[in-house]
């Protein structure tokens, strides 16, 4: 199936030329191109048009989950009939394993997995292995982290066809091999149940059940059904069932891996003993031996990813498999906000290695743990055969890689001009700002301030609140979901002013903002570099009255570059508008575009309606004396019920309540171990 672009708009301004140049470059096999597009010029729409014309599977790489979600939503809108998937880290919380030798502190791995994102990740890999060409995967830097071997994943795909002869028990065993779990009582994602000749499979990568009906040893019917109502959604003549987990292996591979691990353990223990590290040798022997027993008995152990090289059959030092391996040979990578994303890709390997060196040197892990890692930057470059870098401020690396192939997109479809930039002295800057804020409030417009420190952002917020200005701040200490809510509140008018440090830059789509104030603009550094100033100024480019005020006592090179480049673009935009009789139009954009439909607004509602914490809202189950007299089956049922309550509370963002259920769960599990082992 080919890509089918759906949009009420047609390419205008610089877009038609940009689309043509980028498309020609990709079709001619040009390895790297750069799209230099100003804020609000429709870069996403341009890329969507390129994808539709080249008809290749495409990876869109963004530097954080929030922007990835925004892009996913936009591409879903452009390609409703095609496979647009989302692949980011599925951890709601992740504390990596680490050892701090200075204080002799071992930090155990701790995590919480988001079930919904896990489903979306599986949907992405399943779409890529389906053989479709019309696949767009929007991803964060997670795409370069290790995952299962795609060939092992594909070997466990179950193909069924109506009318084919297939023993039902053989089919059930194949489901188990694909890591589906039988559960005839409570069917959840990744489970299946059997009722007579009917097998219901809750697919791990969709929200639907697959119902397979047998007539003896013949497949009589295949249909997707609604898991709640049981109503048939669609019948099928044939169907591919993809595995329930990204990490697949076989019994033979597991046994071979255990033998290799034990051989390497013997060598590493002997090495530690030869250099006088008897304690490390003993620690390593005990930990790895315990892990091997767990794998033999249960098929997994805590930290099994550190043995991934053995299960994948890779040689020492070779790169891990990652999402890029699931793409066909001929695919396109689009790196959004490349001036930030590329350095992030480059840094991942070094950070991971620095943490694991201590774990290996002090006997917590085998050296093979070093091979459970993200790609090195050089490995990523080798796999990225065709790349389009997208940025309003591309860095030197992108320009060198593109070898001069830079496609400029300066004209906005709305006719909006780059904002006017004024430089004002820092003396009495707050009084000056108060006057500017009042002017914007009268017009029902919004204001962004950017400061150099979190403390300054908080103190400025307090000052403005004391002067009856509706405002709030966002910085790295404010969690992601709360940031989304605050920015949405700004658009709604709950706040007139938003103050931040480094979060008011790439990708924030706030058309109501007509003024951006940059405090301490002359303090050269990361936050006041040419690229940072240009990106920050761009936040005012989506408003017809857009204006930027830089408060500074001297003109720095970064300020001069930003002002000169902005003026050059304004001249080009003005000339185009005059030549084509275009009057700038204010952008009007719907709020709350989200990965999960209206999840952002639902989350915001849940946040505002959260229960006040006064006392535990449910009785302490583990403290109930009746628990001591429960049978094993009753205890297991109680544990499962508590786990579900915890997950439901977390889904509703009732985190205090979820934490209470978590504590109950741990107590019940401890009681279970005490009584039955």
Model region roles, listed by residue range:
Residues 1-36:
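Conserved pre-motif I regulatory segment
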Residues 87-432, 436-442, 461, 495, ...:
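N-terminal cationic and glycine-rich segments that engage phosphates or anionic surfaces
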Residues 27-34, 56-57, 133-135, 445-446:
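Pre-Walker A (Motif I) flank of P-loop NTPase domains
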Residues 478-501:
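Conserved helicase ATPase core of P-loop NTP-dependent helicases/translocases
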Residues 69-77, 97-99, 459-463:
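Short amphipathic alpha-helical segment within the helicase RecA-like ATPase core
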Residues 80-89, 303, 446-448, 460-482:
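Conserved RecA-like helicase motor-core motifs
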Residues 28-50:
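Walker A/P-loop
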Residues 57-69, 86, 277-280, 440-462:
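Conserved strand-helix element at the start of the C-terminal RecA-like helicase core
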């Amino acid at each position: 199936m080919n890509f089918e672009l759906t949009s009420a708009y047609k390419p205008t301004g610089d877009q038609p030329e940009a689309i043509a140049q980028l498309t020609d470059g990709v079709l001619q096999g040009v390895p790297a191109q750069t799209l230099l597009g100003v804020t609000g010029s429709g870069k996403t729409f341009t890329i969507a048009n390129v994808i539709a014309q080249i008809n290749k599977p495409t990876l869109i790489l963004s530097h954080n989950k929030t922007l990835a979600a925004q892009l996913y939503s936009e591409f879903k809108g452009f390609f409703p009939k095609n496979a647009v998937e989302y692949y980011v880290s599925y951890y709601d919380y992740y504390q990596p394993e680490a050892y701090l030798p200075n204080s002799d502190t071992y930090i155990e791995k701790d995590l919480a997995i988001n079930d919904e994102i896990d489903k979306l990740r599986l949907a992405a890999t399943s779409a890529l292995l389906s053989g479709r060409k019309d696949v767009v995967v929007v991803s964060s830097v997670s795409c370069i982290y290790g995952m299962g071997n795609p060939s092992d994943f594909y070997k466990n795909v179950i193909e069924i066809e109506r009318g084919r002869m297939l023993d039902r028990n053989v089919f059930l065993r194949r489901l188990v091999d694909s890591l589906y779990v039988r559960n005839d009582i409570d069917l959840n994602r990744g489970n299946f149940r059997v009722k007579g000749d009917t097998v219901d499979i809750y697919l791990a990568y969709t929200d639907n059940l697959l119902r397979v009906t047998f007539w003896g040893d013949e497949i009589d019917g295949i249909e997707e059904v609604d898991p709640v109502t049981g109503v048939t959604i669609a019948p099928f003549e044939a169907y591919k069932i993809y595995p329930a987990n990204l990490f697949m292996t076989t019994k033979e591979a597991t046994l071979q891996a255990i033998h290799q691990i034990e051989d390497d353990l013997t060598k590493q223990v002997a090495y530690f003993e030869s250099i006088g590290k008897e304690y490390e040798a003993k620690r390593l022997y005990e930990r790895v031996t315990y892990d091997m027993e767990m794998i033999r008995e249960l098929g997994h152990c805590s930290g099994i990813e550190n043995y991934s090289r053995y299960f994948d059959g890779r040689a020492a030092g070779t790169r891990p498999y990652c999402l890029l391996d699931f793409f066909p040979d001929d695919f396109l990578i689009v790196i959004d906000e490349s001036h930030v994303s590329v350095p992030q890709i480059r840094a991942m390997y070094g950070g991971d290695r620095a943490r694991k060196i201590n774990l290996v040197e002090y006997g917590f892990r085998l050296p093979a743990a070093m091979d459970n890692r993200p790609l090195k930057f050089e490995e990523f470059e080798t796999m990225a055969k065709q790349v389009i870098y997208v940025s309003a401020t591309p860095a030197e690396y992108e320009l060198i890689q593109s070898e001069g192939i830079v496609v400029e997109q300066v004209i906005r479809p709305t006719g909006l001009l780059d904002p006017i930039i004024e430089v004002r002295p820092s003396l009495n800057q707050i009084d000056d700002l108060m006057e500017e804020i009042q002017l914007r409030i009268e017009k029902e417009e919004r204001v962004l301030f950017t400061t150099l420190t979190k403390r300054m952002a908080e103190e400025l917020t307090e000052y403005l609140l004391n002067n009856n200005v509706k405002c709030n701040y966002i910085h790295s200490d404010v969690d992601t979901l709360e940031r989304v809510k605050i920015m949405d509140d700004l658009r709604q008018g709950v706040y007139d002013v938003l103050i931040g440090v480094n979060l008011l830059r790439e990708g924030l789509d706030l058309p109501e903002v007509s003024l951006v104030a940059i405090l301490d603009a002359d303090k050269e550094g990361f936050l006041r570099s040419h690229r940072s100033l240009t990106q920050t100024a761009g936040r005012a480019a989506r408003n017809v009255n857009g204006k930027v005020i830089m408060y500074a006592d001297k003109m720095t090179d970064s300020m001069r570059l930003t002002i000169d480049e902005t003026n050059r673009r304004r001249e080009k935009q003005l000339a185009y508008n005059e030549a084509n009789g275009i009057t700038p139009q204010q952008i009007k954009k719907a709020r709350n575009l989200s990965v999960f439909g209206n999840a952002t607004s639902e989350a915001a509602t849940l946040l505002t309606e959260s229960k006040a914490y006064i006392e535990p809202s449910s009785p302490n189950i583990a403290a109930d004396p009746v628990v001591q007299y429960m049978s094993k089956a009753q205890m297991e049922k109680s544990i499962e019920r508590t786990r579900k309550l915890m997950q439901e509370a977390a889904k509703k963002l009732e985190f205090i309540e979820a934490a209470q259920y978590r504590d109950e769960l741990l107590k019940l599990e401890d009681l279970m171990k005490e009584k039955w082992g």
